[in-house]
Amino acid sequence: MSDVKFRSIVATFPCQVQWGDCDPAGIIFYPTYFRWMDAACWAFLAAVGYDAKRMRAEHFAMPLVSADCQFLYPAQQGDRCVVRSRIARFGGKSFVVSHEVVREDGMALAKGSETRVWGKFDQGPGSRLRGQTIPAELKALFRAA
C-alpha cells in the first residue's frame, strides 16, 4: 500500500445510541462503533455513486481486511453522534478509511480506521472474488478540491 496520504472529502453519517447499543453499565457496547464505521463507509461510497445496488450489479466488493478503534469517551443511551469519514490512503488495490465518532456537543467519543480491498467477483456475488486495481476515476470522486 502506498504511504502517500490522500486529501479526501469528508462524509458525515448521523447515528444515535439506542438502548440495545448499551452494555449492562449503561454505556455504549464497543461493537456498536464498528457497526457505525461499517455503515458510514458504505454510506460514503453511496454518496459518490457507488451504492450497494450498483456494487452488486457491477460485481464489485470491498471486503474488510482490518479494523481498529480507540475508545476515547463513553457514550450513553440517547446520545446523538456523527461519524466523520475520509479516505486516509489509497494503495493499488486497497484503501484505508479513517473515522471519528463525535457527540453532538463536540466530544470525541472514538476514532478508528478500516482497511478494505477493492475487488470484483468473476461472475457476480458468490463467485470467486479477486482484488482489482482501484480505478483513478473512483479515487477522483473522493479527492478534496
Place the predicted regions along the sequence by residue.
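Hydrophobic beta-strand-centered segment that forms part of the acyl-chain substrate-binding groove
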Residues: 44-95, 109-111
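Alpha-helix initiation/capping motif
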Residues: 22, 26, 60, 127-131, ...
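HotDog/MaoC-like acyl-thioester-processing domains
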Residues: 2-7, 13, 76-80, 87-145
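Catalytic strand-loop segment that frames the active site of acyl-thioester-processing enzymes
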Residues: 2-47
